[in-house]
């Protein structure tokens, strides 16, 4: 079986053939698709294989209950997790292939297709009704993410200062990483306010999401786990934060925490003077 207009590696081709065979033989499955970078024509040798299937509404709960058995029809995975996501399995096979299987029911499938896809199997010709549309990002949710990034920064800075006051360098280093990640999240929102990867996986495919040259000042903050070096890094991160957070807060009508900034900057300056 070959997918039109798509070049796959041999190992991905083998998995795709097993996936299609499993879908064809399973009466619960009515359609299956190739999605992700392979469907977009942007895959490279390091890309994973993103697959998507649709079940009947009546069979969906049964499929969810037996999804691991279905996944094993593709091969014996060494890793199989959902990370708490209700409609996806993450798989790693012995040959190193990484596969993601998304699944949904017929009545819920319409909202998924906000990116290119390739039809693998369609028992009911339902794909003819699919209209490719851009995904709508909830701007209110994005504004709330921004508010959290702006305010949580000071909470993390407080922990960083407390850790150094107690000479707990491991804790301080961890908080420094949180501070930097917060700045990266702000930079992503500054570049594209509809960017959803600004909190939990802020570094995820960041080179594809924004010009990373704008993050150059933060490079020097990857420093040794030493008090002096971390204080200097915190100062750089703080400056980057203020350059990003203030205009974003103004643009999206979020009250900037002026008094909180004053208090925390004074604490940071004091501990810097005491070094």
Residue ranges and their predicted role:
Residues 35-41, 167:
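Short, solvent-exposed loop/turn elements at beta->coil junctions and helix N-caps
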Residues 44-47, 104, 113-114, 200:
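Short aromatic-enriched loop/helix-cap "lid" or pocket-rim segments at secondary-structure transitions
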Residues 23-24, 32, 179:
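Hydrophobic C-terminal alpha-helix "anchor/cap" residues
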Residues 96-126:
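A contiguous, low-structure linker/loop signature
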Residues 116-148:
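A short, charged helix-loop
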């Amino acid at each position: 079986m070959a997918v039109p207009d798509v070049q796959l590696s041999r190992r991905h081709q083998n998995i795709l053939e097993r996936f299609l065979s499993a879908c064809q033989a399973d009466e619960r499955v009515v359609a299956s698709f190739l999605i992700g970078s392979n469907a977009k024509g942007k895959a490279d040798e390091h890309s994973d294989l993103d697959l998507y299937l649709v079940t009947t509404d009546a069979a969906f709960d049964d499929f969810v209950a037996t999804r691991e058995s279905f996944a094993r029809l593709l091969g014996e995975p060494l890793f199989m997790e959902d990370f708490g996501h209700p409609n996806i399995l993450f798989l790693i096979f012995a040959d190193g292939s990484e596969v993601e299987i998304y699944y949904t029911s017929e009545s819920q499938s319409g909202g998924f297709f906000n990116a290119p896809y390739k039809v693998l199997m369609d028992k009911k010709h339902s794909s003819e009704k699919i209209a490719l549309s851009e995904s709508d990002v909830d701007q209110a949710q994005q504004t709330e993410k921004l508010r959290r990034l702006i305010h949580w920064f000071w909470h993390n800075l407080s922990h960083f200062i407390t850790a150094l006051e107690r000479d707990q360098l491991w804790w301080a280093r961890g908080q420094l990483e949180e501070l930097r990640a917060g700045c990266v999240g702000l930079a992503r929102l500054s570049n594209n306010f509809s960017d959803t990867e600004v909190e939990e996986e802020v570094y995820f495919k960041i080179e594809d999401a924004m010009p990373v040259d704008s993050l150059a000042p933060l490079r020097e903050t990857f420093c040794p786990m030493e008090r002096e070096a971390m204080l200097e890094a915190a100062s750089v991160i703080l400056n980057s934060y203020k350059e990003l957070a203030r205009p974003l807060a103004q643009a999206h009508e979020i009250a900037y925490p002026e008094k909180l900034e004053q208090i925390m900057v004074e604490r940071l300056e004091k501990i810097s003077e005491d070094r």
